[in-house]
UniProtKB/Swiss-Prot annotation:
Catalyzes the transfer of a dimethylallyl group onto the adenine at position 37 in tRNAs that read codons beginning with uridine, leading to the formation of N6-(dimethylallyl)adenosine (i(6)A). The record marks 123, 146 as: Interaction with substrate tRNA. The gene is miaA. It comes from the Bacteria. Pfam families: IPPT. It comes from Natranaerobius thermophilus (strain ATCC BAA-1301 / DSM 18059 / JW/NM-WN-LF). Its cofactor is Mg(2+). This is tRNA dimethylallyltransferase. NCBIfam families: miaA. One of its GO terms (biological process) is tRNA modification.
Amino acid sequence: MMNTYDNQHREQQKLSENILKTKPLIAIVGPTAVGKTDISIKVAERLPVSTGIISADSMQVYKKMDIGTAKPSQEIRTKIPHYLVDNVEPDEEFSVGRYQKHAKSILNQLYQNKELPLLVGGTGLYVDALIYDFSMNELPKSTKYRQELQQKAEQDGLEQLYRKLEKVDPDAADRIHPNDQRRIIRALEVYYYTGEPISQRQKRRYDSPYNLLIFGITMDRNKLYNKIETRVDQMIDQGLVEEVKYLLENGYHLQLTSMQGLGYKEIAGYLMGDYDLETAVQKLKKNTKRFAKRQLSWFRRDPNIKWLDITETDKSEICDKIIDMILKEYLE
């Protein structure tokens, strides 16, 4: 009779053999604070083969920005390899195209090493760029028009550009933060150049070049909002104010894309004397809830996502379901 060890060894051997042949790609997505990180780590620890976690978070790529981006601890990242975390300085630009290029290279390396890739994050455009292999070259770049928009933002305020985006592409406006100047300008630029809303271009689905299995983690909205409030309070206790103060004192100004991220802009306003800390915290909670709503809107339109509701379900039970589906998908 074959024992448990023999079964596990067979699973490990077969899964390793299938990785290079079938190019599996597992993704765990969902709104901020829902528990993606914890679930992904538990799944990676329990899978019978070595697993590398690729971050699909547009903020975790920045160094020196740890608390506000809720990065996994260094201890966890030492135990389980994490990629595209702490890659660039806060004053460096990191585009979707650059993300896609790095992520594809990491994927290929994992396949060569017969390691299973686990994509985890809530930045929908990053997720889609990798799993559906969108061509970044098909989105035109009009430098002159971009400069005009940048000047307009400086002269009239970013709010004016955001209102324009709401008129020409309400779907994109719903998914882009009103403070995200780079993406607002990019969306307007694509519309100007092509006459087609960027949201429509992004809705086109291509067949994934990977053997894709994508899970969406969700929960009751009120419970999610409570978790967001708790997370923000924890970030303050962990030293978010000091983190933002350090960044500002070291020359990382508010015009940088990185400093427009949730937590950094709100706390910077407090540090610059625009309002008190309590107001900053309330702003951050409100903006994070709005962000979570936009994330859910983005992922809900993807028919490939297998949704798992953890409102009344223990995380370990969710992990069991994910692992069972992974083994069924890639072992048979």
